């Protein structure tokens, strides 16, 4: 064999030429993560505009409460004053001059997102101003006052027991049909299921987080 002759091609020696992998697009953030990022950026902007200037390291629970009160100007929830004729009515029959405020549920969700964003940005749980006791007390006061003013009680929903207590020796309803379906390989998709209930938090707009 002539050593000066052409050698085997790289394609033949190593198989098919390597193809550069296309860059993967960045993973799309979930709705929660996107909202958390917007809320965090809004809070940082609030600190930059604060007078006197305020840094995140010096931020306390009192500053967080001040921020929540600042957000009231962007609220969309009518909160009746104690002297209003519609005070305590969940469905007032007409308009009134009472101001719009941030709903308690929106503020509560906002604080939860900011509390998580603070620690994700390097803060420690011990120094987290969004987890301060003063903030929890403030949110509780907002909840109670809005419940009275709007006539809408805020109560924790108790999970209903999936099955009522059955007498001894009595088979729960539906178990025989489920067993028959399992034995015969039948389609169980047509069976009744519990409907899931979701509660959507209203979103905000403009320069403030979606806490309205």
UniProtKB/Swiss-Prot annotation:
GO biological process, alphabetically ordered: mRNA transcription; post-embryonic plant morphogenesis; response to light stimulus
InterPro entries: ALOG (IPR040222), ALOG_dom (IPR006936)
Annotated Gene Ontology cellular component terms: nucleus
Residue numbers covered by motif Nuclear localization signal: 156-160
Highest rank taxon of the organism: Eukaryota
GO molecular function, one term: DNA binding
Function: Probable transcription regulator that acts as a developmental regulator by promoting cell growth in response to light.
Entry's family note: Belongs to the plant homeotic and developmental regulators ALOG protein family.
Protein name: Protein G1-like7
Organism (species): Oryza sativa subsp. indica
């Amino acid at each position: 064999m002539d050593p000066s002759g052409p050698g085997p091609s790289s394609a033949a020696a190593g198989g098919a030429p390597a193809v550069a992998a296309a860059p993967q697009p960045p993973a799309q953030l979930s709705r929660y993560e996107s909202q958390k990022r917007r809320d965090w950026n809004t809070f940082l902007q609030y600190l930059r505009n604060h007078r006197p200037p305020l840094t995140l390291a010096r931020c306390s629970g009192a500053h967080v409460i001040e921020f929540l009160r600042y957000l009231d100007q962007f609220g969309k929830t009518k909160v009746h004053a104690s002297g209003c004729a519609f005070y305590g009515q969940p469905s007032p029959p007409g308009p009134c001059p009472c101001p719009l405020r941030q709903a308690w549920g929106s503020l509560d969700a906002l604080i939860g997102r900011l509390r998580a964003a603070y620690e994700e940005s390097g803060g420690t749980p011990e120094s987290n101003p969004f987890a301060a006791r003063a903030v929890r007390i403030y949110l509780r006061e907002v909840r109670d006052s809005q419940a009275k003013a709007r006539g809408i009680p805020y109560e924790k929903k108790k999970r209903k027991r999936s099955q009522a207590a059955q007498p001894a020796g009595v088979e729960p309803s539906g178990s025989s049909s489920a067993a028959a379906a399992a034995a015969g390989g039948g389609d169980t998709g047509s069976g009744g299921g519990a409907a899931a209930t979701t509660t959507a938090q209203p979103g905000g707009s403009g320069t403030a987080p979606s806490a309205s």
